[in-house]
Amino acid sequence: MDNYQGQHGYGADRVDVYGNPVGAGQYGGGATAPGGGHGAMGMGGHAGAGAGGQFQPAREDHKTGGILHRSGSSSSSSSSEDDGMGGRRKKGIKEKIKEKLPGGNKGNNHQQQQMMGNTGGAYGQQGHAGMTGAGTGVHGAEYGNAGEKKGFMDKIKEKLPGQH
């Protein structure tokens, strides 16, 4: 008869601390320990009747008091990028990972070269329009063609005097 009753003579319809019904499979329900007490060996792993035969939950709740704790690291990678047509498109996970890897921005060099070519800046400059030397002031006119794409070295060679 002891197998059909729960702890302290109550019926077998028990609930946990959250109000969820506890079946016989979760805490060991109807089986009794070989010592004869109420301490059943179940999922919790707390066997023995040393604590008055009460079942102890296997996990502990960690409460933070309603405060969200954040780590000190910050990562700001935008989730969208320019699609080349004046609009935006969402980046895939592959692009985000490549963006974070050192030296993995090979796909972005093409965009940067197009922008740098229109401003007349060289590698390492911040796109200054005025350059020292015998420039004509129309540096970006050659790169306006969409049909002809020039490599990075070709752009540098064009800027050197006497190579035309």
Curated annotation (Swiss-Prot):
Keyword Transport: no
Signal peptide interval: none
BP GO annotations: cold acclimation; response to abscisic acid; response to water deprivation
Sections of the chain in a coiled coil: none
Biased composition annotated in UniProt, kind: Gly residues: 25-53
Cytoplasm keyword on record: no
Bias-annotated ranges (Low complexity): 107-117
UniProt keyword terms in alphabetical order: Stress response
InterPro entries: Dehydrin, Dehydrin_CS
Compositional bias ranges of the Basic and acidic residues kind: 147-164
Start and end residues of each stretch annotated as Disordered: 1-136, 145-164
Family label: Belongs to the plant dehydrin family.
Name of the protein in its database record: Dehydrin Rab16B
Phylogenetic placement of the source organism: Eukaryota, Viridiplantae, Streptophyta, Embryophyta, Tracheophyta
Gene: RAB16B
